[in-house]
């Protein structure tokens, strides 16, 4: 079964509501964590059956934070350069480079 996702691994995105910049590091075809809490966005069955993304963002101190977000929570990021968050630019570039030129392992 092939599921189309709106975003790809290594792509920079923005959280629609909060505006945070992030980098997609993995994609699940549907919600795959433990049972969601009732007040969680994941309690919506329609959203649970759509793609979910593992996204690295930065906290207020510039430390990486792993988030798990529904496709509906994300928006395209038009710029690849963010002087205020260069580590996310570097992460996105590194992931894209690895996807284009994977290392062979014995």
From Swiss-Prot:
Name used for this protein in its record: Heat shock protein HspQ
One GO MF term attached to the UniProt entry: DNA binding
Which Gene Ontology cellular component terms are annotated? cytoplasm
Indicate the segments annotated as coiled coil, or none if absent: none
**Residue spans crossing the bilayer:** none
Q: Which GO terms describe its biological process?
A: response to heat
**Is Protein transport among the key words of this record?**
no
**What is the annotated localization of this protein?**
Cytoplasm
Q: Which SMART domains match?
A: YccV-like
Q: Relate the protein's function as given in its record.
A: Involved in the degradation of certain denaturated proteins, including DnaA, during heat shock stress.
Q: Which family does it belong to?
A: Belongs to the HspQ family.
Indicate where this protein is primarily found. cytoplasm
Q: Does the keyword Phosphoprotein apply?
A: no
Per the UniProt entry, what species is this protein from, by scientific name?
A: Photorhabdus laumondii subsp. laumondii (strain DSM 15139 / CIP 105565 / TT01)
UniProt keywords, alphabetically: Cytoplasm, Stress response
Q: Record's superkingdom?
A: Bacteria
